[in-house]
């Protein structure tokens, strides 16, 4: 096996994001081809040739820079097939390799003039303004060519370092400096634009400033102290990461791989392209125009205007709309910049990296499952057969029901009874994980034992709803299948719903009846004033046991809120114990009968309870019988 076929694994502890130096930006995009040629700089705004539909050389889709657009084929077609792997075509300079390299190979644009990075300039807080200790408004005046800034006062007495000067003020000073009778030997130096900003940042001695600020903090109070702390925090971060402040001003900008900003041909022959290509094209056009103006020694005012336009083009590329007018495309729609692609719910991180679709997972609406135990959930058969398909196929082959995977899949598609039987065996004891977004605490994802149910909705026990913050008004939940034995064990031991009774935040019970359960319990035990209380001994309203009442209710001989007399020898919790009975009489056999508002008790001559009938509703009988039954089973 050759080394080229070996996949190397790089293990790392963390990922760190920091400011890239101009050299690193160029290193990202610069490559030396096997023939020694250095490529990487994008110099032309063209994308593809509309006649040949091939990428233009040195353009935004250049095959020499980013790699071939077709596997193992150079631009001119001289080399085709995998046998020419690694060869660089002498005619077109394209390396013969896989086209997927166009997903990770970068380029760069060498800028004719430095530009400020809009994140550090216009972010909140503005790190450039904090480091230089200049108000943000003044920094913007410098960057966007509205004001000059003093870089060196020279021998001029009235000027201060970092002082802002308007065009007229600087002209007056120039006249004074260059006058015949001038005594100024060392001329003051002023700058404008991102070049001046870069010079100011280069002049900063961070270690010395940090020492001075620490001394100043000890004697400061209130708002001034807070401002100093903010500044020293930024300086310490620069020192800790070995980053230089002048890196916040860009000399080169990276061009992301072409397959991440594609251009596709539509049916009518037209092309649809990523907004980034338009933004990059604006930058390249303005950069090339500025380079040409500098080359022909154009007037300073024209060059300065072009530099400002280049700054605005780079701002729009990095974060469109952060400053100035938003760049719009067709239909007056704002173009999506690099920041728009990264940030927000639909951005690269939340949508594509954190919100990835994973195998062995499903999603469906949840409905209440009143007959489930707390550690169980109802899993639709249609979903279960899809999630557990590899396990089912393995068992079908092992039990000699089918001979191969293809036959097993056909049997599964038919929905054969044997398949359902095998599925039942597979899910027995195999926990699944249910997750409801947003997962704000650890109980947002819990393990359950699946029970096969009909329909297409996941059934959930109502008691676990508070932990998930779920209700049954259309909420959806995701299902995940733990595959490894360790994962299954962990799910069963730690994540099973019946093991998560208490809230990890407060220590109080989180498994509490809510919504449907509270309403159902109230409805079941509610007293209806319009139902007449029966007399004791009424054959249709007197029952020998709780079970008899439930049978009569299920047989529809009695309603849920009707009053009934029922024999019950257990304890009754009511307020009548402290009062005297309404009636008490001795019977011929020596026993005693006591009548209360809601019960009739019969005692023998030794005052032992012989029988007790209570007056209650059918709903309360159902509730009590269910609770007694549950408690006796545990």
Swiss-Prot record:
Keywords: DNA-directed RNA polymerase, Magnesium, Metal-binding, Nucleotidyltransferase, Transcription, Transferase, Zinc
Pfam families reported in the protein's UniProt record: RNA_pol_Rpb1_1 (PF04997), RNA_pol_Rpb1_2 (PF00623), RNA_pol_Rpb1_3 (PF04983)
Positions that bind Mg(2+): 471, 473, 475
Enzyme class: transferase
Cofactor: Mg(2+); Zn(2+)
Gene3D superfamilies per record: 1.10.40.90, 2.40.40.20, RNA polymerase II, clamp domain, RNA polymerase Rpb1, domain 3
Cofactor note: Binds 1 Mg(2+) ion per subunit. Binds 1 Zn(2+) ion per subunit.
UniProt binding sites for Zn(2+): 74, 76, 89, 92
Listed GO MF terms: DNA binding; DNA-directed RNA polymerase activity; magnesium ion binding; zinc ion binding
InterPro entries noted in UniProt: DNA-dir_RpoC1_gamma, DNA-dir_RpoC_beta_prime, RNA_pol_asu, RNA_pol_N, RNA_pol_Rpb1_1, RNA_pol_Rpb1_3, RNA_pol_Rpb1_3_sf, RNA_pol_Rpb1_clamp_domain
Catalytic activity: RNA(n) + a ribonucleoside 5'-triphosphate = RNA(n+1) + diphosphate
EC number(s) from the headed UniProt entry: 2.7.7.6
GO cellular component, as recorded: DNA-directed RNA polymerase complex
Family stated for the protein in its record: Belongs to the RNA polymerase beta' chain family. RpoC1 subfamily.
HAMAP family hit by this protein: RNApol_bact_RpoC1
Its biological purpose: DNA-dependent RNA polymerase catalyzes the transcription of DNA into RNA using the four ribonucleoside triphosphates as substrates.
Subunit structure: In cyanobacteria the RNAP catalytic core is composed of 2 alpha, 1 beta, 1 beta', 1 gamma and 1 omega subunit. When a sigma factor is associated with the core the holoenzyme is formed, which can initiate transcription.
Name assigned to this protein: DNA-directed RNA polymerase subunit gamma
UniProt source species: Prochlorococcus marinus subsp. pastoris (strain CCMP1986 / NIES-2087 / MED4)
């Amino acid at each position: 096996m050759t080394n080229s076929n070996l996949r190397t694994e790089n293990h790392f502890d963390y990922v760190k994001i920091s400011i890239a130096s101009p050299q690193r930006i160029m290193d990202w995009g610069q490559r030396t081809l096997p023939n020694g040629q250095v490529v990487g700089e994008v110099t032309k705004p063209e994308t593809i040739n509309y006649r040949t539909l091939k990428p233009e050389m040195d353009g935004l889709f250049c095959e020499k820079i980013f790699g071939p657009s077709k596997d193992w084929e150079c631009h001119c077609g001289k080399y085709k097939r995998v046998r020419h792997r690694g060869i660089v075509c002498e005619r077109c300079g394209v390396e013969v390799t896989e086209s997927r390299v166009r997903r990770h190979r970068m380029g760069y644009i060498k800028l004719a003039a430095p530009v400020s990075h809009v994140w550090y300039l216009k972010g909140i807080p503005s790190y450039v303004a904090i480091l230089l200790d200049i108000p943000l408004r003044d920094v913007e005046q410098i960057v966007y060519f509205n004001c000059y800034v003093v870089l060196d006062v020279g021998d001029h007495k009235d000027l201060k370092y970092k002082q802002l000067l308007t065009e007229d003020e600087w002209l007056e000073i120039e006249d004074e400096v260059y006058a015949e009778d001038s005594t100024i030997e060392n001329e003051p130096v002023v700058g404008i634009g991102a070049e001046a900003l870069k010079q100011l940042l280069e002049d900063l001695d961070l270690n010395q400033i940090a020492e001075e600020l620490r001394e100043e903090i000890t004697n400061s109070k209130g708002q001034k102290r807070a401002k100093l702390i903010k500044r020293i925090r930024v300086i310490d971060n620069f020192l800790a990461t070995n980053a230089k402040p002048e890196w916040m001003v860009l000399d080169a900008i990276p061009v992301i791989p072409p397959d991440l900003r594609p251009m596709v041909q539509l049916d009518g022959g037209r092309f649809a392209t990523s907004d980034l290509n338009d933004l990059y094209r604006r930058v390249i056009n303005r950069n090339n125009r500025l380079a040409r103006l500098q080359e022909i020694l154009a007037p300073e005012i024209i060059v300065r205007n072009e530099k400002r336009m280049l700054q605005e083009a780079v701002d729009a590329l990095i974060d469109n709309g952060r400053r100035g007018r938003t760049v719009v495309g067709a239909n007056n729609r704002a173009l999506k910049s690099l920041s728009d692609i990264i940030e927000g719910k639909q951005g690269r991180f939340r949508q594509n990296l954190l919100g990835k679709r994973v195998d062995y997972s499903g999603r469906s609406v949840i409905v209440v499952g009143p007959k489930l135990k707390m550690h169980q959930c109802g899993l639709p058969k249609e979903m279960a057969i899809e999630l557990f398909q590899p396990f089912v196929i393995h068992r079908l082959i092992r039990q000699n029901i089918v001979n191969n995977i293809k036959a097993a899949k056909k049997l599964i598609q038919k929905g054969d009874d044997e398949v359902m039987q095998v599925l039942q065996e597979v899910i027995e004891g195999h926990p699944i994980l249910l997750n409801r977004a947003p997962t704000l605490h650890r109980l947002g994802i819990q393990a359950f034992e699946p029970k096969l149910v009909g329909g297409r909705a996941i059934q959930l026990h109502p008691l676990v709803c508070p932990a998930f913050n779920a209700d049954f008004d259309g909420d959806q939940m995701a299902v995940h299948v733990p595959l490894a034995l360790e994962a299954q064990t962990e799910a069963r031991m730690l994540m099973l719903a019946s093991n998560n009774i208490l809230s990890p935040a407060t220590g109080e019970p989180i498994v509490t009846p809510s919504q449907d359960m509270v309403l159902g319990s109230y409805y079941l035990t509610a007293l209806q004033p319009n139902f007449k209380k029966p007399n004791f001994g009424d054959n249709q309203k007197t029952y020998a046991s709780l079970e008899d009442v439930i049978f009569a209710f299920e047989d529809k001989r009695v309603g849920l809120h009707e009053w009934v007399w029922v024999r019950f020898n257990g304890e009754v919790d009511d307020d009548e114990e402290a009062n005297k009975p309404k009636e008490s009489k001795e019977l011929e056999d020596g026993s005693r009968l006591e009548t209360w508002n809601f019960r009739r008790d019969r005692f023998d001559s030794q005052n032992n309870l012989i029988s007790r009938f209570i007056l209650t509703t059918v709903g309360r009988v159902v509730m009590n019988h269910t609770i007694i039954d549950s408690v006796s089973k545990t």
